[in-house]
Amino acid sequence: MGYREDVKRMKALTDENRLAILLALQHGEKCGCELLEELNITQPTLSHHMRILADSGLVAYYKEGKWMHYSISAKDVQEFRDMVGSYARCDCETDSSVICRCENES
């Protein structure tokens, strides 16, 4: 995955509504109707934010009848965590040819 995909995922988390949606989904799948009521937002607002979360890969969805059902994409969230962690590590942790002084800094 490249920088553009990393940025896309990070940007998906820079909105209060999207963070609230992820928190609402952390205990399992929810119907769009449940999210509308729980978060007190409109249908167009939910659709907008879900599209961004789904495009970033953080949320999965499927349609049942007239309602969309949403859940956190565990695999993609783990990839996101790994990606964030990779930016926090020094190259010397994974590449023995890199010489640095990070071990002395903490």
PLM feature segments, named:
Residues 18, 48-49:
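Histidine-centered divalent metal-coordination motifs
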Residues 45:
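Residues in the helix-turn-helix
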Residues 37, 48, 54-55:
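Alpha-helical residues within the helix-turn-helix
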Residues 2-5, 74-106:
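Amphipathic alpha-helical dimerization/coiled-coil segments
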